[in-house]
Curated annotation (Swiss-Prot):
Gene3D superfamilies, A to Z: 2.20.25.10
InterPro entries membership: Trm112-like
Domain of life: Bacteria
Disulfides per UniProt: none
Family: Belongs to the UPF0434 family.
Name used for this protein in its record: UPF0434 protein BTH_I0741
PANTHER family xrefs: PROTEIN PREY, MITOCHONDRIAL, ZGC:162634
Coiled-coil intervals: none
GO CC terms: cytosol
Length: 68
C-alpha cells in the first residue's frame, strides 16, 4: 500500500485515521472498529463492505503491520 495514499485516506464514517493491516489486507479504523478491505491493491472504502473488528484488539499504529 502506497504510504502517500495512506496519508490522505480517512474513515468514511468518522473521518479519523486509518491503519494498514498488511496481513489482513485491510485499512482499519480503531475509533469505529471497522476494517475496510483492500482488493487487488485498491481500498474499498464503502461502509457496506467493511467488517466489524473484534472488541479490544485495536491495530497498533506503531506495530509491524503499519504501512510506511
Amino acid at each position: 500500500m502506497d504510504a502517500r495514499l495512506l496519508e490522505i485516506l480517512v474513515c468514511p464514517v468518522c473521518k479519523g485515521p486509518l491503519h494498514y493491516d498488511r496481513g489482513a489486507q485491510e485499512l482499519v479504523c480503531n475509533a469505529d472498529k471497522l476494517a475496510y478491505p483492500i482488493r487487488d491493491g485498491i481500498p474499498v472504502m464503502l461502509v457496506d463492505e467493511a467488517r466489524q473488528t473484534v472488541e479490544g484488539t485495536p491495530v497498533d499504529p506503531a506495530g509491524p503491520a503499519q504501512g510506511r
